[in-house]
Amino acid sequence: MAKNKLPLADVTEAPHYHDTWTLLRKYRDVVWSLEVSVRQVRNRFRIDYGKTIEDFLESVYLAGADLSGTELEHQAKCIEQSHKMLCLVDSAVDLMRAKHKNGEEFYWLLYYSYLSPQELQNVEEIIDQLRPHIRDISPRTYYRKRKEAVEVLSSVLWGYTAQDSAGIVREFLQ
């Protein structure tokens, strides 16, 4: 009986794959921007209103004031959206780390490549940091495993495509 195989598209051509790469490449910048934005809003409230943002919002809520359409509402929504995106990525990375068979290894690959607070200068520095977590790692192995880690993270973030699922079901049924 011949195996019925569908041609598989190159994973690097899938849009969710590129979305994940873009998301990871911008992760540090988004974290930085979010921290700066929150700090600026907090400082502005202390200067303008003489109280914390939490105290200000509580007094607005108690007074029944409506902040719709204000600059404050716009800033809050931007900060909230960035925070939710970071939480989504962090949650997906945590799930991958805890549940995937190579999760711990993939976590450290993604951490030193994209998620750590300080960007490392080059692949050699990343590999040096990875050595305690992944033995016998070479630059070639690093790139291969990093690609695998991004693919796994993509599947957690965006789900499997129907084509991916069909292949899994075929393998399971054989």
Q: Which residues does each predicted region cover?
A:
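N-terminal interaction/assembly modules
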Residues: M1-K101, W158-Q174
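Aromatic side chains
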Residues: Y17, Y27, Y114, Y142-Y143
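Short, well-structured alpha-helical interface segments that form or flank functional binding sites
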Residues: T22-R25, K84-S91, E104-W108, I137-R144, ...
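Alpha-helix C-capping/helix-to-loop hinge sites
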Residues: L95-M96, S113-S116, H133
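Alpha-helix capping at helix-to-loop junctions
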Residues: A98, L115, E119, S155-G159
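Short amphipathic alpha helix immediately N-terminal
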Residues: K101-E125
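Helix-turn-helix DNA-binding module
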Residues: P117-R140
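DNA major-groove recognition helices of helix-turn-helix
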Residues: Y142-Y160
